[in-house]
Amino acid sequence: MSIKKIEMINFRNHEDTAFDFSPGINIIWGENGSGKTSIIEAVHILSNGKSFKTNRLIETITSNKKEAIVKAVFGDKNMVFHQTKKPSKKIKINNIEKSTKDLVGKNPTVLVSPEEEKITKGPHSERRRFFDRVFSNISKTYFNNLINYSTALKNRNTLLKQQKDKHEIEIWNNPLIKYGCQLWEERKLLHSKFNKNIEGVCGGYNKKVDIAVSLDCPSDTGQNRFKNRLNEKLEKELFLGRTLSGPHLDKYTTNFNNKDLRVYGSQGEHKLTFLIFKIAEHGFIKNETGKKPTLLLDDLFSKLDLERGNAIFDLIKSSGQTFITNTDLITAEQHGIDINNPNNKTIHLVRSWKN
């Protein structure tokens, strides 16, 4: 489902701007600080209920203003994002308020931006977060198990920090075990499928590249074994104030040509792996759900050589609606994008003297 138009009021540096979009490729270009990224950030918030720039949506409100409003037409639906300084966030679809949970998987997006590069360069927690988000987009069951497990984990950790009675702590063991084991079961299945998508992308690359993601989790993920691990580690957990067993500790390791990318990878290998991850993510969501995710490319072409840029262009050709931000049109053309195609649209932004 493509976004037809958007209006932003006091959102970042957009005081009152509106744009119509093409269902194909939309190139948003202009100098830095002109508000290019803010447009795809707004699309991301409406699709996911979250920003990729900040965890505090109050920061999206224009300086010295009381609220930010984004209105958009997604297919046949009217959507509104309203953020006040209380702080309070509301997202409505056809005047019916929706939670972030309601939005997950409805209008999936694939974001390719500098903020996402930590997927390969960052700690295991970044890759867990990435895969949890991707898997939640294609499986409501996975998402619900993740939410329920996270709630049980948070409550159990609170009791551990407070040095509560063991019987109180054990109250949260049952939901932790139930949802944790269900999470493990589906995580292993989806992880295997995602690796096959990576393998397919690597097979189409003109250089010999072998990339795979290993998942380090217990070999026995049954409920009895999980319960035993919790009992065995309880004394240490009380001392440290946190739960020491469960899916929240799983480790994803990226191997590039049989070596740990995070430890031994070059900058070029990180960039290539990141792009392959994103191409695989797009194909994975499309294959599993039948939906073509909206592609959000933020300031990408200026950082890519021609070969890697062409790999992204191949992704664009297989995508639905695409948004690209760039400082000029020349590099987009160099990577094969026809700016004169009537199915594509260019939007030129000029930096305001107020910014």
Identify what each model region corresponds to.
Residues 36:
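Conserved lysine of the Walker
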Residues 44:
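Helix-to-loop junction immediately C-terminal to a conserved catalytic motif
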